[in-house]
Curated annotation (Swiss-Prot):
Anthranilate 1 binds at residues 91, 122. Signal peptide: none annotated. Disulfide bonds: none annotated. Its EC number is 2.4.2.18. Gene3D superfamilies: Nucleoside phosphorylase/phosphoribosyltransferase catalytic domain, Transferase, Pyrimidine Nucleoside Phosphorylase, Chain C. Binds 2 magnesium ions per monomer. Coiled coil: none annotated. Keywords: Amino-acid biosynthesis, Aromatic amino acid biosynthesis, Glycosyltransferase, Magnesium, Metal-binding, Transferase, Tryptophan biosynthesis. Pathway: Amino-acid biosynthesis; L-tryptophan biosynthesis; L-tryptophan from chorismate: step 2/5. Catalyzes the transfer of the phosphoribosyl group of 5-phosphorylribose-1-pyrophosphate (PRPP) to anthranilate to yield N-(5'-phosphoribosyl)-anthranilate (PRA). This is Anthranilate phosphoribosyltransferase. It comes from Shewanella baltica (strain OS155 / ATCC BAA-1091). It is an enzyme of class 2 (transferase).
């Protein structure tokens, strides 16, 4: 008879049965603490994948990872009457398209337009250049301390939180994920475990089948308001076709579709949004933020920033949000913000504030 306390939970999964939210949190807690063998980890992830993860199981895994995360000292949420919450603009990755860095660039635009954006990101999943790869090109320190990141959020309306810096326990799963060579629950967990605990989210998913389930997970996790989107193959709001949406608002979830026309912009081709290596994508992002990007690039960023501005209540419609985002892009304010963030990041390193992290 096994003395391993998690073995009975694994046995439930191996029988094709579901775990409760609490049971899943217990399993993932063991994984994060390094108390699960790689064989058991692989068995757990495959068993969940083959049956299909439930809302409770995804929520429980997120609970465990949130609880184990390095704390993030959020700026006082109540000291500013205009500051009614933090928003994240994030995608699962894994959509298979090598696009420009839409959500990362949109984060600068939304912040310059007045949103408080704490973007949780990692290195590339589906493209040649993930959010962290891009930021490194601009000299933004990926591992700035939580205190420095919090100051950036307070002063500049924006910070970037590098996932491995806050979720050290995930390293135990890396060899297994690489060996399995298939999507697992970890592919959807990243956007759910932002240590800033954003009240608002624009969350893109790689599959249309995930849109409603992930909206239900966000509701279970206590997210105040969100749009979960899949845009004609992309984990973003689409410029090249329809976007499937599940919007969480006031505890209810409504499903609908958005077209580029609904957002006030013309249709474009997916090929117009093709990205490259980090250095090339950095030049593209810089051009967009200076108001000198191509129409398709500017519009793709604006519709995503616009939906984030709508979700956090700065505008009362996605179309109004897109118009505000386009005006912000043309003003050059978003590029000024990027320059300020890089400056603060560099000063923190020079002053030694990032030591002893």
């Amino acid at each position: 008879m096994s003395t391993n306390p998690i073995q009975p939970l694994l046995d439930v999964l191996y029988q094709g049965k579901s775990l409760s939210r609490e049971q899943t949190a217990e399993l993932f807690g063991a994984l994060i603490r390094g108390e699960m063998s790689e064989a058991a980890m692989a068995g757990m992830l495959v068993a969940l994948k083959m049956r299909g993860e439930t809302i409770d199981e995804i929520s429980g895994a997120a609970d465990a990872m949130r609880a184990a995360a390095k704390p993030f000292p959020c700026p006082e949420r109540n000291n500013n009457p205009l500051h009614n919450g933090i928003v994240d603009i994030v995608g699962t990755g894994g959509d298979g398209f090598n696009t420009i860095n839409i959500s990362t660039t949109a984060a600068f635009v939304a912040a310059a337009a007045g949103a408080k954006v704490a973007k949780h990101g990692n290195r590339s999943v589906s493209s040649k250049s993930g959010s962290s790869d891009l930021l490194a090109q601009f000299g933004i320190d990926l591992t700035m301390s939580p205190e420095t990141a919090s100051r950036c959020l307070d002063a500049l309306n924006l910070c970037f939180l590098f996932a491995p810096h806050y979720h050290g326990g995930v390293k135990h799963a890396v060899p297994v994920r690489q060996a399995l060579k298939t999507r697992t629950l970890f592919n959807v967990l990243g956007p759910l475990i932002n240590p800033a605990r954003p009240e608002f989210m624009l969350l893109g998913v790689y599959s249309p089948e995930l849109v409603l389930p992930i909206a239900k997970v966000l509701k279970a996790l206590g997210t105040k308001r969100a749009m979960v989107v899949h845009g004609s193959g992309l984990d973003e709001v689409a410029l090249h076709g329809n976007t499937q949406v599940a919007e969480l608002k006031d505890g209810d979830i409504i499903e609908y579709q958005l077209t580029p026309a609904d957002l006030g912009v013309p249709l474009a081709q997916i090929s117009d949004l093709e990205g490259g290596e980090p250095a090339q994508n950095a030049l593209i992002t810089e051009a967009i933020l200076k108001g000198r990007g191509t129409e398709a690039h500017a519009n793709a960023v604006a519709i995503n920033a616009g939906c984030a501005l709508y979700v956090c209540g700065i505008t009362d419609s996605v179309k109004a949000g897109t118009l505000l985002a386009l005006a912000t892009i043309q003003s050059g304010k978003a590029f000024e913000l990027l320059s300020q963030l890089a400056k603060v990041s560099g000063e923190a390193l020079v002053n030694g504030q990032e030591r002893g992290r």
